[in-house]
Amino acid sequence: MAQIYASTKPGVNPAEGWAAAIGSLSTGANLVLNNSELLKTISDKNGQLYDKKLKDFEKWFLPKAFAFGEGFEKAISPAAWEKFLKDLFEKADQGWKNFYKEQLEEGLLPALLDLTDFLDKVLEPFKTYNKDGKYHIYDPLTLDLDGDGIETVSHNGYKGALFDHDGDGIRTASGWVASDAGLLVVDRNGDGIINDGKALFGESSVLKDGTKAVHGYAALAEYDSNGDGVVDAKDADFDKLRVWRDLNQDGVSQKEELFTLEEVGVQSLNVAYQDTNQNLGNGNRLSQEGSYTGKDGNVRKMGDLLFGNNTLYSRYSQSVNLTDEQRAAANLQGIGRLRDLREAAALSPALAAALQAYTKAETKVQQKALLDDLVDKWAQTDPNYSVGTRFSAPMLRTANEGVALTPGQEKAMLMVGSVSDEYKEKLHELRTKIAALDAFSGEKSGVIYVQSKEQMESFLKTVRETYGKLTDNVYENLLFQTRLQPYLNKIGLKLENGEFKLDFTDVAALFGEVYARSPEKAFVDLGEFLAYSKISSGDNAFTELSSLMAQYSLDAVNSGTFEQYAEALGKEAMEKLGHKTGTEKDDTLYGNELANFITGGAGDDAISGYGGNDILHGGSGNDTLQ
């Protein structure tokens, strides 16, 4: 911990004290930013809220502290120096509050709240069903430039390449070629950038007749203007072709990554190919194989690849210009085919109204009542939004996939057209939830192919469960930007025994004011504040607030409202807080290191608070409390 040791002893240069104080402020800022789990992981279920913007606090505040230090020359006596330090500290505290408020208002913190890693796991069961949107995608022609074969890498979320393969303006996580291989490209619009899949040679290539190519070799064939089976300098547009080596593997072309064919040693490209189905590893496959001839006379591999992808991880190629008011709105990072929440709201009056109503809601009950509408309005900004999902029973067979049935399985198989009205109605009832899951995942679920009633039931159950987890995560990630934000705005800094610490005094006072008006609201707000903010359990502020929560719980028991309040707060939050209620039987209940409230109910109970400033309530029976 940083110590303030501004010396005022005779013979000591006061400037040393000033340097120490500023050094302490610097370290104190780092203390706040690095040691406070609250500000690093607020409302982020996976604890992955990036702290890059928060670290700007030190850069933001220290110049202001030095500017404030112009009054240092007046600190010529211990009393004056003490006053100066006090003023400086107050400046630090106010600076912190202003900085944090600015971050919230500008959306710098909320914009970093990321749903993707958590939802990637949540949505996986939904994505595994056989749908009409299931197809092999993204087949660019790729050149083996170093002679060791075409090497690829797996899609890797936001850490890997994001590329707009189909030209819809959305870059998605894609399998990719290694940096020692090259994608054959052509800058069709002349802007010096490989904007999307239309600039590659693959299924997104637009042919001269306006149709799309079936694969990369079909697109390449149009560049063989003299029809001799190779594309070389004798062909009209040979000099327009480029090879893109994505050296930094981000899926974004830079000027220094685009090479002429001559620069990478290519003499000619052979139009002939053979169909294949080679597994290249990393979720990528080789679908057509051909070759090219180098300037050195060597023949090397050129192949049409099928990249794996994850449409959940996405970025729109073009951002939306926001007004100051729109930038101040609550925000979540866009995923699938959805923009960031506040960008989507800027383009959709319906979503903007839903977000405003949700933000103004003052209780959990009110927000939960508005949550489905908010998620639905956000989902409707999906450019491919559709609620036309249906079940289909026919068996399917593709070039690479088939179905084999045992006699027992054949009996269980649905006959064509046998989807009952009952299941059609059940699916219809879930249509908006399915559309939302499609929008968030980037999937397409126009038709769900099933072979049995069990598969239909399984799909319907998966939709309900996955949608529930999605909305829960959206709710938790918006908590501290909406209903609980006023409490965050009260966080300050304090100087305790020469150390900078977060100060929750005003936070506790605000909870007290709310409690005086509505004990249930204060109970739920404080419970969620503690359950989802992830304040370090070793922080004194956490101990004080958890003790306050335990007192609210005891008050609720005494007033007969505890069960009502606990139900409003929710089982998950209660468990996170370590608050437990026994049954009518003989229970053994343990708390955790927090300030727990544990009530035994009926029966002869054994209750241990474990650690923290606990309130243990035995209830009826012959109880043991420790």
Task: Give the label of every model feature segment.
Residues K301-V450, E457:
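Charged, amphipathic alpha-helical linkers/stalks
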Residues P10-G17, S24, I42, N46-L49, ...:
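Alpha-helix capping and helix-coil boundary motifs
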Residues T41, K127-Y129, G492-L493:
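Assembly/interface hotspot detector across virion components, adhesins/toxins, and nucleic-acid enzymes
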Residues S26-A29, N226-V231, G618:
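Short, charged low-complexity linear motifs
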Residues P125-A329:
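Extracellular/luminal recognition modules and glycoprotein regions
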Residues N540, E544-Q626:
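Glycine- and aspartate-rich repeat motifs characteristic of hemolysin/RTX-like Ca2+-binding segments
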